[in-house]
Amino acid sequence: MVSLRDNIEAQPLSHNRRIRKNFGHINLVADIPNLIEIQKNSYEKNFLQLNIKDSERKNKGLQSILNSIFPISDSSNIANLEFVKYEFDTPKYDVEECSQRSLSYAAPLKVTLRLSIWDIDEDTGTREIKGIKEQEVYMGDIPLMTKNGTFIINGTERVVVSQMHRSPGVFFYHDEGKVHSSGKLLYSARVIPYRGSWLDLEFDAKDVIYFRIDRKRKLYTTTLLRAIGMSTEEIIKFYYNSVTYKLVKNKGWAVKFIPQHITAHRLTSDLVDADTGNILLKAGQKITPRLAKKYFGEGLNNILVAHETLIGKYLSEDLRDPANDEVLAKIGEMITADMLNVINDLKIKNVNVLVINPQSGPYIRNTLFADKNQDREAALCDIFRVLRPGEPANIEAAESLFYNLFFDTERYDLSEVGRIKMNSRLELNISEEVTVLTIDDIKNIVRVLVELKDGKGIIDDIDHLGNRRVRSVGELIENQFRIGLVRMEKSVIERMSAGDVDTVMPHDLVNSKILVSVVKEFFSTSQLSQFMDQTNPLSEITHKRRLSALGPGGLSRDRAGFEVRDVHPTHYGRICPIETPEGQNIGLINSMATYARINKHGFIESPYRRVKDGCVTDEVVYLSAIEEGKYKIGQANSKINKDGKLQGEFINCRVEGGNFVMVEPYEVDFIDVTPMQVVSVAASLIPFLENDDANRALMGSNMQRQAVPLIKTDAPFVGTGVEGIVAKDSGASVLALHDGIVEQVDSNRIVIRTLEQKVDGSPSVDIYNLLKFQKSNHNTCINQKPLVKVGHYVKKNDIIADGPSTDNGEIALGRNVLVAFLPWNGYNFEDSILISERIVKEDVFTSIHIEEFEVIARDTRLGPEEITRDIPNVSEEALRHLDEVGIIYIGAEVKAGDILVGKVTPKSESPITPEEKLLRAIFGEKAFDVKDSSLHVPSGVSGTVVEVRVFSRRGVEKDQRAIAIEKQQIEKFAKDRDDELEIIEHFVFSWLEKLLVGQVIINGPKQVKVGQTITTEMLKGLSKGQFWQIIVEDANVMNEIEQIKTHYDEKKEALDKRFATKVEKLQSGDDLPQGALKVVKVFIATKHKLQPGDKMAGRHGNKGVISRIVPEEDMPFLEDGTVVDIVLNPLGLPSRMNIGQILETHLGWASINLAKKISTLVKEYKNKHIGIEQIKKFLIELYGENINSILERPEEEIISFCKKVSKGVHFATPVFDGAKVQDVKDMLKLAGQDPSGQVKLIDGRTGEYFDRLVTVGQKYLLKLHHLVDNKIHSRSIGPYSLVTQQPLGGKSHFGGQRFGEMECWALQAYGAAYTLQEMLTVKSDDVNGRIKTYDSIVRGENNFESGIPESFNVMIKEFRSLCLNVKLEVTSS
């Protein structure tokens, strides 16, 4: 067998990796989890369970919904429809085809259903099976997720954002004293289910407990307790303890002494031991809990109390007459003086009363006696009347309603999470499978609420991340599915009851349209299904990691208060405290922290390293906010010695509630994995984040997402080390699927022969077609460029091609430019930016934007529209860019007003004049009965046509252009097929050759003789086909050849089949919208150079607008003649407090000067002045141990590495663990620069030095998506508003500039009467005046008259609508 690693050692791709000098001190023990796995796990693993056999699927997601909805039975229980299994077919179109054809990327869901028909004996009621039919039923197309975690819906890429909502369970809170004027705290409890009715319990100002269902009218809580079946006695015994008062003759009552019930107070009577008669404390003396415990310990069991002490106490059981057992007073009644006399008269020796004291109030007892419902039936009817007002209440209806509210699994669902939360809060041990309320739940909720009122326990914090959970894509779609299937269930039952069940098949019962429409509606219109932010790869990743508190079932902007939006201590390591929008959504839309992940219950977890006996281990544990509260957690930058032990006497740790305490090392349970785990991906890309003010860091993270991909991008010289991870996970770059060797590379595709051998030992081939100049969702340009060369050995997951905004596998949102901080002639006033002409000339910040234009030829009432070059009344000049079909050529340069696609529409017949008749007779019909409805380039757009797509309806004949495009595409498919086949053939025939050489021929083609021994030369004279005709003596070899042939034929057949399928799909015509015959899409690419008015920003929230482009010779320059690229205002720093940008500039200055130093060393090495050792020594001094892998390689590779860093040395300064000021100074010294980072600058205009030293350095700047070209426009003529007759406003309406109230004041202030009159009349809404003015301009006259503005007429009409008849009377002068 041929060794596959024949030229592997050629050159591993990893040699091209960029090495950064890392300033971080903390070793990473955990990798950043895949940044988009939150989306993929939720949908593919948990909801669809895609590549799992149906027998191994867990009861979650789609499986659990189908299990819960089925079986469906009809009303008479004769037919029963059961669910067996489900599976997905392969999608009809792949992702690329869907986005091109404006379709949704979805797979057909096939569900196997079993319909059982029963025979019921009318006499005995016994049932037996009559028949079973099983069938696979199509249930609609379910959207699939692309490999990047997005959905393609109607051709556009969308993201479903995860939602933060209140976790199901029970929550206790108080009103913070806001409701009652006295400031009394009113406690309440709320049970929030995942779906179903809400249950609220609340105290009122009089300490009576009420409950509400779904915020309806309130009822006494004891009504609820009675409704669940509790009697008065059970209620009182459950919520209160009882104590017995025993009669002591002539002395009073003896009662048990309980020290726990004693609070500090002065005694009103003596404290007497009932057993001994000793007086322990006199009246007026003070007793404390401590003293009470002392007495109890000394043997005080019972105390004597006065006779009248019983007055005001409550009975804990019925008071009965000892003689005849007659009930004298009911349980719970208060003992009055009269009742006490009766007790004395009847000589009742023992009286049981409730223990009611400051630690346990009489709230339940008071509520019980306020409530008029005395039994379960009355309670249920009372609840029924509140929920169904106006309906007659009978016990069956009331019982059924109450059961359905909280105890029916179909209508009420706490979810597993809700049950776990409920059990932990109420200290219960109910199975997690019980997801409805139980009687124990309700009893204990009331108990905990009363305990809170009594001062035991604490209320819940709703903003704690243990009480908020995340609903990701899978769960959101699961809920929609459930809605759809419940609707479908109703229609199934109706169809079962309507038809003849014996002849019906499962597919006749199921109407999949109901389900499809619900899912479609969610993806198209839900607030959480959003148009993906595709400006650059970072904005894509951030969008997928976003957490929104808005949306259905969430908060609304207007009602969200400050607490919900604020940063909470539990956000640490879970939600980024920095990245959130400015404006009304602040704090409601958040980003997940870099290392965070979501657990199976929907709670966010953060990783920590376990600490054992003060020793930090490499074990990483993920904790949720609830679990974290139990531990003491140290910070990642705690000092650790070589043995991994925590150093120092005390360690600063976080404990529950977000407080920090100092503890000894052995008490620490965990430490953070890395300081970076606190912030999100965007914030972790900001170097020196720790030196920036938080508000500016917020702007920095948000503005990085608006950076436009440039034609040429640079990775930042000063990075944070996360750049590579972001580029890899974003999906913008192309990753190798398997280990392999690069066989072919061009700008459009990469062909790799993989090294993972198949069963037969043959290689497979991976072909990567790169995206070229594709339009993103935000009209930026998606373009991929290969990074590999032929012969490179690539490993699985290596980056083999850069995408937009990536550079050598690292994210690169902007460019490194040389900046100087100094004022320059006022041109950098208020954050304006001054740029050098070089930046425009060399396309440093030039970006490509692609616009899509579409034209549809429809079938109209008067006949079909036609795409043609034959357009009436259009000159040949205007048609110069169109082909014979009427569609523009690719590569044509177009500007506003040019025709892109010629189209004519039939127009209705109108009566024609004799002259027209004559013209028609002479010149034919055509020109008259159609009107021009061509697609023109809109105003403000110009550029080059880069792509044209033509879609024709099935059955409509394709035009030449469509056929040409199709042919091009088929050639591309054929090339992919041929290249793959060629690689396989090369392998197969080399293998055959190895097998055949040295064998003796028995039979073969004409060119070979029987009995000859085969040589390599002999085989060279044969064609490939003749190899298979050779038969040799060795039977084993012949078997092996037979196997190879079978595999080869199978592979070839599979390739041909795949090619045929693709071609068939391409030629089959398209599914176009109703009435459309043909759709043409034209893509125009526009180059946007940097110009005044464009917005630029750094990574630290430092943003500004370009004010002027200055010739290079006028810009300040360095002593060596280098011209500064950008001049920024130093006054933008002190008040903004984003000092990180200055440290970045200094380190950037070190970067380019170190690069110069390395270049100088290389030059000297080439001139033989120094040896390689000096270069190695300098590299070690600069990079430290990072560089060892390079230094072990041959000399030429070390020199090649040095050349790669000739523009600048790349640094990584991780967030909160990066370079300190001293490190920056050390680097500047190493580069031979002044440690202040400041230099002498020369003014380009005068040639003189500036008065003082200036901070100069390399800084990373971004061009933002707010381009002046898309904002500024001008109008000469255009549309007018119908009512006011004033020009419309805004760029989209091609409107004018508003001359508003304040502008009028300005002209009035100057007394410019005529200018003002002109503004308010002919230039605005004087209809006649403006027509006359136009005429006079045409005639070349310079005079005009102002008439009455239309707004005056509008005002008069408004007066008339108020019944005031105002007339304008014009008197002649």
Curated annotation (Swiss-Prot):
Gene3D superfamilies: 2.40.50.100, 2.40.50.150, 3.90.1100.10, DNA-directed RNA polymerase, beta subunit, external 1 domain (2.30.150.10), DNA-directed RNA polymerase, subunit 2, domain 6 (2.40.270.10), RNA polymerase alpha subunit dimerisation domain (3.90.1800.10). One of its GO terms (cellular component) is DNA-directed RNA polymerase complex. GO terms for molecular function: DNA binding; DNA-directed RNA polymerase activity; ribonucleoside binding. InterPro entries: DNA-dir_RNA_pol_bsu_ext_1_sf, DNA-dir_RNA_pol_bsu_external_1, DNA-dir_RNA_pol_su2, DNA-dir_RNAP_su2_dom, DNA-dir_RNAP_su2_hyb_sf, RNA_pol_bsu_bac, RNA_pol_bsu_CS, RNA_pol_bsu_protrusion. SUPFAM superfamilies: beta and beta-prime subunits of DNA dependent RNA-polymerase. It catalyses: RNA(n) + a ribonucleoside 5'-triphosphate = RNA(n+1) + diphosphate. DNA-dependent RNA polymerase catalyzes the transcription of DNA into RNA using the four ribonucleoside triphosphates as substrates. Keywords: DNA-directed RNA polymerase, Nucleotidyltransferase, Transcription, Transferase. This is DNA-directed RNA polymerase subunit beta.
